[in-house]
């Protein structure tokens, strides 16, 4: 047993305890009991963990510790994700910052991959160190990296099986293309940002001298315009893609243009003729009702191109510059495939001579090309108008660049059949969402699913298991080149080259529930408990990846194993800063969990927040804001204070505003628990209440302390409250209501145990009834030991440290709290305990009322007061007599006297408890006149402040124009002033 210090210092024991737990193997599955499994969403190996990780990992660890104490066979599967794009970007930047003149490209693929592996080792170690410091009780011996041999084999197996089943195909389609990274990216990595732009109207001349009578009507159907026109006006926000137009399009029921459907227009700047087509996707009210169709550079236009069999003309290269030579493609539909299904359509080259890009535009960046094209159109009299327009601009979340819809050969997964099955599993309850409203989000995404582009033009990641014949370009899919050659009888004369692309990160992540359990290797599956631990019990994750990860795990796990990946999906909110802003490096508001746990100096915090910025110009602004917010740096709070803060903030379905002040408050809670334990230990030093012991078997085979046989009302009350909070703890764990769990345990520990029972125990401990004193000592120890077990899943370090001091006093021989059984609600004698509980609740009301009077009158704590009683019921008289010793002790009373109803009371401060009137005579206690004058003056001052605040908040200009934070601050001030005024008036009324 370690030395018990007089003050709470988490740095003195947290790291030591974790090392002891891990060395003893306490984190490993026991192999007995009901399986309880949690999958850790693997953090990316791109740096360090942030508050979002700490938030989710704290909740997961609480669940794991709770179920471990409940006797379940717990497995927390942890690991890290290779995070293809993110990691490649970070390492590429670091290579350049090393100052050796090296770049990703100069290193070459193998050299760069070696650099990434070095980074992965460094980053992975940092992540594990952070998780350990937080208290994560995971089986580290099973930690998995998504590019370890076993998961990599699973990736290859899944790809090959899906390809052989026809679910994976390779084809030309539009993808999200980042022109800086020069790779396809997922929808998740695209942020649509509302930005101000322009809407240009361009004249497309009708071919062959065709004219038409243009007629427009108002909303009532009245003709408002009739004129002959020889061109169509097309509205666009992207004139630079005009060179790739292959049609213009109108709505089939738009009377203005029905006569022109099937005619052609001459494409400006190129002289190429394109057809006027009709499609119901056109909005007749947008612009002129005529839109350009550029299938190779717009997602909607691509689908139109498929439906209408339009050529695909690519005019931008992979860097978003105008191609020097045009690259045009067209459609050829195999006879045995459904027409119009773009997944089954082959693309053929179209002779380049049919499509010409003006030479002076070749090679221009897309925005330079836009300027030049607009200038050319204006010169030719074809630019009709340019008006401001708000549009949604797709930007890559890593580079900030505008993403291009880009036509390229990629690998895809057909999602319709998989999605139908994934939706069915959730609809019938095989997978449950908590909170349940998230099923609506899941349902919407699954009903609107598209084929999944899984290939990325990167070096870091799982190479696609496909080999190309260098002679004719045909490709073969297999688990290895040797398998491909054997299966297709390819001799050494055939030169094969593996696809240089890699699979997107989510492809391997979707296999996480079962690849970590050894799939597809039968031996590994048996060793890692595939049958025992799949499905897992719960997935704790954020709502932002319900589709991109959660849905794909459901679909893949069902397809490859015939099982669901997990029973419950607990969706958390996002962690934001105290002002509700998203935490990000560019905002400079990111908090490292370790800085809250162990503290950090101001200079180190500024350096951490300003180093490695994607936009270095923000460094000065971030440094200034950091120095203002944390003038003294961040003090150490310990892991437990951070964990309890997280639990208390974990409300269902809402984003979390993280306020460091809350962590300070819960550090005080830990300190309160520490001091209460010191009190109990000091007052039970010679306790022998555990002997003779009445044994009951504990989970770990050790004896449990005997159940108290209470001799006082206070003991019966605290035991009844302990039973209630124990039952509530189990209920809140089952409901994933960590906030309500933390609140219930906090209220019991701070208010009921520390503030009340410890105080109510003192009269018994110091009284002459030795049996009551012994019983009270045992109950103090028993309740404290049970409370430490209740709190352990949330705050494991301090509870373990304190428990090791308390347990021997109860005759407990076990060496660690984390393997002790979680408390179960006790069945108490209803009538006796209920009566005692009611009596103590009455006593608490009495004491609180009289303490408020003392506080209101500013009576020093050491000053004794008199108490007069008037009225009340017979039960009140009984309770006054019964609790006389406790009342004198707790309230420092000189005497208690009863007044008859007819007796006039002296000037007194008054409180009412039911029908009982409590009077504290003022004579000799305070200078009543002076106190009245002081309160009157203070009331006027506070009323003046309230008037000022009301004046500001009733001013519409202030409310509408001041920053939101300033307005909220003023509202908060008004609330504080109002509360203060009510208190002053109450005190004045007392006098």
Curated annotation (Swiss-Prot):
Region described as Disordered: 689-711
Compartments where located: Cytoplasm
GO CC annotations, alphabetized: cytosol
Binding site for ATP: 585
Family stated for the protein in its record: Belongs to the class-I aminoacyl-tRNA synthetase family. ValS type 1 subfamily.
HAMAP family registered for this protein in UniProt: Val_tRNA_synth_type1
Free-text comment on this protein's domains from its UniProt entry: ValRS has two distinct active sites: one for aminoacylation and one for editing. The misactivated threonine is translocated from the active site to the editing site. The C-terminal coiled-coil domain is crucial for aminoacylation activity.
Main location: cytoplasm
Pfam families found in the cross-reference section: Anticodon_1, tRNA-synt_1, Val_tRNA-synt_C
UniProt biased composition (Low complexity): 693-704
Gene Ontology BP, a term: valyl-tRNA aminoacylation
GO MF annotation list: aminoacyl-tRNA deacylase activity; ATP binding; valine-tRNA ligase activity
Coiled-coil annotated spans: 925-988
Keywords, alphabetical: Aminoacyl-tRNA synthetase, ATP-binding, Coiled coil, Cytoplasm, Ligase, Nucleotide-binding, Protein biosynthesis
Superkingdom of source: Bacteria
Protein task: Catalyzes the attachment of valine to tRNA(Val). As ValRS can inadvertently accommodate and process structurally similar amino acids such as threonine, to avoid such errors, it has a 'posttransfer' editing activity that hydrolyzes mischarged Thr-tRNA(Val) in a tRNA-dependent manner.
Catalytic reactions on record: tRNA(Val) + L-valine + ATP = L-valyl-tRNA(Val) + AMP + diphosphate
Motif 'KMSKS' region location, chain numbering: 582-586
Record text on subunit structure and interactions: Monomer.
Chain segments annotated as transmembrane: none
Protein name (database record): Valine--tRNA ligase
EC number: 6.1.1.9
Disulfide pattern: none
